[in-house]
Amino acid sequence: MHPLKVCALVGALALSSGISLGQGNAPQGAATAPVESPPPAERGRYLADIGNCVSCHTRAGGEPFAGGVPFQTPVGTLYSTNITPDPKTGIGSWQADDLRRAMHTGIAPDGSHLFPAFPYTSFTKVTDADVDYIYAYLRTLKPVSYTPPANGALFSVRWPMGLWNKMFFREGRLAADSKQSEEWNRGAYLVEGLGHCSACHTPRNLFLAEQPGNPYQGGRIQDSVAPDKVRPWFAVNLTSQKHGLGAWSVADLSKYFQTGVSLRAGTFGPMNEVIVNSLKRLTPADAHAMAVYVKSLQGPELTGEAVAAAQVASGAAIYKDRCEKCHGGSGRGGFFSGPPVAGSAVVQAEGPASLINIVLYGPTVPQGMKFGGWETMPSYADILNDDQVAAVSNFMRGSWGNRAAPVSAAQVAQQR
């Protein structure tokens, strides 16, 4: 499963409610590829890596980019397409302008609307030149004759997506901000465009379109917690507020993008594929540019219900027994013990799903991605009951200056 399952969910839920999903100026500060002008296909490979194309277009055990990844939704299953240059089952018959149209408008060569599991709502911001580089790269791939399984019946209905697009989609390339540095603009271009970070990290409205007034304030997604087991996750708030990335520095973010670990956190869950197949391949300059842009994001502080003192106290003993050895009595963790939970965006997230998942299932970490003396956290699903998981979660969400809404045993039960 992939973090972008949320985009398929957009299409599915909009269909179930009767509404489906369906050129500006190039930014001056957005260089189109790594320096030293490598051949177009090599530029395209790098850009496709930033877009993380391989994760959503490569099924388990399948050929790279041949599609077939299932996007499970409440109204059926949607499968990713074959984007190898096979002329019959892939996109071998596509021309460069066909890919531009698909990425910029969400329209296929035959005029049908694409589902936003393919995040054209973000890709519309990518320059024509960069799309052409990606096209050049895709043409070099091994053609694979493979037809993904048929989509669920409701996904055969595509025309209503045009209405959704008119309501919520704005086509156009990303314009540079003359008030910001070239590095900031480069970071904005990568985060907003190919990186499509908002697809997971921005909350959605009633029709499951991204809320333009609340960018990067966290979003609900669906992904695996264990083999063949999908549960909700909460993609953290990326703004520099206290409950977001306020405790992170630009250096922390840049290191995390390139290695999956930093003094603040290590990758786990839905971010694993994003790190391994995409961000880890960034040049140092681009990783730093993205970090500069992300660190500039602003949003309001949380003002809702907070964990009460009695709820905090109820989980203190569990934390001391099960968590303190690695995360410390101060919640600050350490290079030789574990990541901090004080100031953690995951711990303080508006939705507690990701925190609960870590406690229940442990954070699955990519092989070889270890920081300092951090040990792999065990699963507590068979050790702690729902009340205990809620209690220790509340202790962390209400201690060391953390502030977040309380977690209930019912919420824990939903994640099992």
Predicted regions and their residues:
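Short Fe-S-cluster ligation motifs
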Residues: Y79-R100, D228-S240, S354-G373
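Positively charged n-region of N-terminal signal peptides that target proteins for export
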Residues: M1-V6
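Extended, polar beta-sheet/loop recognition surfaces of beta-rich domains
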Residues: F257, A342-D387, A391
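Flexible coil segments in periplasmic/lumen-exposed cytochrome c-class electron-transfer proteins
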Residues: N25-P39, I50, T58-L78, P109-A188, ...
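Bacterial N-terminal signal peptides
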Residues: C7-G18
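Aromatic- and charge-enriched surface segment that lines or borders ligand/interaction sites
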Residues: I91-I107, G111, Y133, G246-V250
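C-terminal structural cap/anchor segments
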Residues: A316-N357, G373
